[in-house]
């Protein structure tokens, strides 16, 4: 996964609770036809069922619509959620399974962003989507649940976070850009903030960072 990740430093940590509470927006893809332990492409394959006939756009739209609104979700075993003081991924790596608490989430929008593609060689189908959701949502699990609605195993095959904490992808900077700016700042004491990092700069609360330069 890539995309927007707000990072708070110094006095800016005072706004973390507000950033965390905000919703998020993503774009990504769901591949139908197989499932993995992690619900994405990083895990081991645990199920496969050929998609012999590609689902129509209307069928996909109907499946996404079923996952829209106020819904409940079971977090994946490979996640940081704690159960009895242990992270779920600790249980998963030990080969253990535990009962996972339901989470109440809200999916504000879940739509196709372009036509799906069908691979006749692997008999898989890939859906391309955008989703707006509340905090605590596992998009991997949304992908799996879409597959369940359609009657086939599924994984999240790609994901980019477009918006988080009020910041959009266009406002972000890369770690490489930050490192380059820090080098410039150290060599030029008059440069005391990220104000001149250009239109991609995501540091909206610039004044809060001055003491950390």
List where the protein language model places each region.
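Catalytic/RNA-binding core of pseudouridine synthases
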Residues: 1-213
């Amino acid at each position: 996964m890539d995309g927007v990740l707000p990072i708070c430093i110094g006095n800016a940590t005072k706004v973390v609770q507000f950033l965390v509470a905000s919703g998020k927006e993503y774009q990504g893809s769901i591949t139908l036809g197989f499932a993995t332990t992690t619900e994405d492409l990083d895990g081991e394959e645990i199920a496969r069922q050929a998609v012999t006939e590609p689902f129509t756009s209307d069928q996909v739209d109907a499946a996404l619509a079923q996952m829209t609104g106020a819904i409940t979700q079971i977090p994946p075993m490979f996640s940081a959620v704690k159960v009895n003081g242990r992270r779920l991924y600790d249980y998963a790596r030990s080969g253990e399974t535990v009962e996972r608490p339901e989470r109440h989430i809200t999916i504000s929008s879940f739509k196709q962003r372009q036509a799906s593609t069908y691979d006749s060689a692997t008999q898989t189908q890939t859906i391309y989507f955008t989703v707006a959701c509340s905090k605590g949502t596992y998009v991997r699990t949304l992908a799996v649940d879409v597959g369940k609605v359609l009657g086939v195993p599924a994984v999240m095959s790609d994901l980019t976070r477009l918006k988080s904490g009020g910041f959009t992808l266009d406002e972000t900077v890369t770690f490489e850009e930050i490192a380059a700016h820090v080098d410039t700042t150290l060599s030029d004491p008059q440069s005391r903030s990220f104000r001149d990092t250009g239109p991609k700069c995501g540091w909206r609360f610039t004044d809060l960072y001055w003491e950390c330069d």
